[in-house]
């Protein structure tokens, strides 16, 4: 019988949102359409229209030894062309952001190939071939309900702010002030790229989502939202893992695991 992945335990809306993020068969709601060139500007690795820099010749031009694994795995387009590795990094506010670091790590690994990612307390980096990363960033990481202009920041450096209070417009604090709230349009504008270099012209990433919408799609348990302690199934799994790691790792005897 084929294995059907469960993705994540829990019976609450938060648990279901996490499962939806991780499940490659679930198509997240598209909320905006940021032009490709604007995504390139925010990432800051190349100029719009500039050729991709390469680190090796196209694979079809390379004289490589036989490798069964390489024959089995279809390379990404960026790998085929020899494009270099680049990154994009996001900071997620604790105030009902749609995504958060561990959710991002699990989602990236379930949905995408050829990625490397690193989890920190308030930010998550993803690295892959540059051309593939640009497409992934636009089509999933920014255009969909995985992103909110106010509660998620694209920050390659000086990422602090995820746990700080929001400003009067609901924007997460950013020490480099990469984005501003346009009171005329109600949209968020990026005036700097992800590492804080000023842009020639602002990039419009759309209108912040209403608080009700954020609470509906967030993957964060909060006492003023959906408390984690309300999800009995999740608590059972977390306690089991904690007990197995603590007691099993320290003294891996049969009676420890019988009590799990």
Swiss-Prot record:
GO BP annotations listed: methanogenesis
Enzyme Commission code: 2.8.4.1
Reactions the enzyme catalyzes: coenzyme B + methyl-coenzyme M = methane + coenzyme M-coenzyme B heterodisulfide
Pathway in which the depicted protein is active: One-carbon metabolism; methyl-coenzyme M reduction; methane from methyl-coenzyme M: step 1/1
Coiled-coil ranges (or none): none
A UniProt-annotated Pfam family: MCR_gamma
Keywords: Cytoplasm, Methanogenesis, Transferase
GO CC annotations, alphabetized: cytoplasm
Domain of life of the source: Archaea
Self-association and partners: MCR is a hexamer of two alpha, two beta, and two gamma chains, forming a dimer of heterotrimers.
Family designation: Belongs to the methyl-coenzyme M reductase gamma subunit family.
Protein name according to UniProt: Methyl-coenzyme M reductase I subunit gamma
Gene name as annotated: mcrG
């Amino acid at each position: 019988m084929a294995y059907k992945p469960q993705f994540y335990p829990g019976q609450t809306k938060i648990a279901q949102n996490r499962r939806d993020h991780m499940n490659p068969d679930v198509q997240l709601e598209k909320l905006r359409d940021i032009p490709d060139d604007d995504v390139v500007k925010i990432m800051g690795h190349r100029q719009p229209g500039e050729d991709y820099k390469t680190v090796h010749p196209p694979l079809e031009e390379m004289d490589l030894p036989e490798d069964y694994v390489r024959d089995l795995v279809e390379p990404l387009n960026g790998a085929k062309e020899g494009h270099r590795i680049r990154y994009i990094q996001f900071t997620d506010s604790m105030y009902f952001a749609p995504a958060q670091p561990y959710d991002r790590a699990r989602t990236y690994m379930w949905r995408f190939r050829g990625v490397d990612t690193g989890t920190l307390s308030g930010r998550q980096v993803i690295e892959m071939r540059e051309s593939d990363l640009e497409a992934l960033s636009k089509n999933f990481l920014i255009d969909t309900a995985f992103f909110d202009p106010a509660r998620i920041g694209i920050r390659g450096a000086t990422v602090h702010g995820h746990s700080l209070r929001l400003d009067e417009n609901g924007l997460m604090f950013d020490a480099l002030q990469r984005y501003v709230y346009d009171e005329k349009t109600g949209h968020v504008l990026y005036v700097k790229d992800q590492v804080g270099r000023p842009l020639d012209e602002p990039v419009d990433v759309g209108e912040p989502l209403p608080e009700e919408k954020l609470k509906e799609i967030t993957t964060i348990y909060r006492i003023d939202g959906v408390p984690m302690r309300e999800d009995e199934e999740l608590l059972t799994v977390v306690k089991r893992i904690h007990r197995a790691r603590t007691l099993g790792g320290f003294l891996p005897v049969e009676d420890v695991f019988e009590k799990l």
